[in-house]
Regions:
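Metal-cofactor-binding active-site regions of metalloenzymes
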Residues: 1-124, 133-139, 145-150, 156-173
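Active-site glycine-centered loops adjacent to acidic/histidine catalytic or metal-binding residues
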Residues: 129
């Protein structure tokens, strides 16, 4: 991850990465895709978050590809709010939602409820990575306190199969 991030600290590199990802998807006959990345992690060398998003959007221009901006669950919830605000600023330019990524253990989505409530109220798409290593507590928090429309991973849902063969009630909500 660190090596990838090191390559995403210049606007021209971010633009190229986005463009090449879009080209690869189109060559694979993908008709629509959403790329996700954490723009606040691409500011180590002085780029503003806005410049980061604009570079990615420039790289995607002309392709059927949109962006999800990731907040990192281990980071300060204020960073999540900054990410949501950034997504709102660029929602009419190709940003379609936000995502909460990063390590589940010890970092429930409930830490970021304020930011994701704002995203939900504004109509942004919300994806939360949950249920990869942690169980139902993480999944419930993603849906109930993170307002998730989609779950990244969610593989722990299968381990919650009830004895009668049914899914946990959360799966039907």
């Amino acid at each position: 991850f660190e090596m990838t991030l090191a390559c995403m600290q210049r606007a021209d590199f971010i633009q190229r990465i986005a463009r090449e990802a879009a080209q690869d998807l189109v060559m694979d006959n993908v008709r629509y895709a959403e790329l996700r990345f954490a723009p606040l992690l691409c500011t180590r060398n002085g780029l503003s978050p806005e410049a980061v998003v604009e570079a990615a959007l420039d790289g995607l221009r002309g392709y059927p590809i949109k962006l999800l901006l990731c907040a990192m669950r281990q980071n300060d919830p204020a960073d999540s709010m900054r990410t949501v605000d950034l997504a709102l600023r660029y929602r009419d330019h190709g940003v379609v939602g936000v995502d909460l990524a990063g390590p589940e253990e010890g970092f429930l989505p409930s830490r970021h409820t304020r930011a994701f409530k704002k995203a939900e109220s504004a109509g942004l798409g919300i994806t939360i990575h949950a249920g990869e290593v942690s169980g139902m507590e993480s999944l419930r928090s993603a849906v109930k306190e993170g307002f998730a429309h989609r779950l990244g991973h969610g593989i722990q849902l299968s381990s919650t199969m009830q004895a009668n063969g049914g899914l946990d009630p959360l799966a039907w909500e």
